[in-house]
């Protein structure tokens, strides 16, 4: 069964609620892997900056909760997440986020192949 990009995005929205609690859980995954998350003002074209050597993620502080969650989720594949260092709850959420992200990426790849 093939899902459209919109269907995958709807599944993401259904699976993840855009609340402060969810933001806290997503931040916890990143922090448990040794990263520091900072919210700052700045001219971020993409809304974020990663300082890999210092394990610092800087996000635009003017993002709403949904934007912060989406940005952190989009960043996860670029970060060195230590799965074994995560708590059980964080591991479950990380697996869920990565599975949804992989489905979305597959759909994007299929879209380019068929274009």
Question: Language-model segments: which ranges?
Answer:
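Cationic, low-complexity basic patches in intrinsically disordered or flexible, solvent-exposed regions
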Residues: 3
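Short pre-active-site segment immediately N-terminal to the catalytic Zn-binding motif
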Residues: 58-70
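Active-site recognition of the HExxH zinc-binding catalytic motif
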Residues: 70-78
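Acidic, Ala/Val/Gly-enriched low-complexity intrinsically disordered segments
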Residues: 7-10
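Anionic group-transfer/hydrolysis microenvironments
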Residues: 42, 62, 76
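Metalloprotease/metallohydrolase-associated module, dominated by Zn2+-dependent proteases
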Residues: 15-51, 57-58, 83-115
């Amino acid at each position: 069964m093939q899902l459209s990009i919109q269907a995958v995005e709807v599944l993401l929205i259904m699976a993840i609620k855009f609340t402060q609690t969810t933001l806290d859980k997503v931040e916890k995954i990143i922090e448990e892997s040794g990263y520091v998350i900072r919210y700052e003002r700045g001219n971020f074209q993409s809304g974020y900056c990663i300082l890999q050597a210092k394990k610092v993620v800087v996000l635009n502080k003017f993002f709403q909760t949904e934007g912060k969650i989406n940005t952190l989720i989009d960043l996860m594949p670029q970060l060195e997440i230590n799965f074994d260092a995560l708590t059980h709850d964080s591991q479950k959420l990380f697996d869920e986020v990565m599975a949804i992200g992989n489905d979305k990426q597959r759909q994007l790849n299929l879209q380019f192949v068929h274009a």
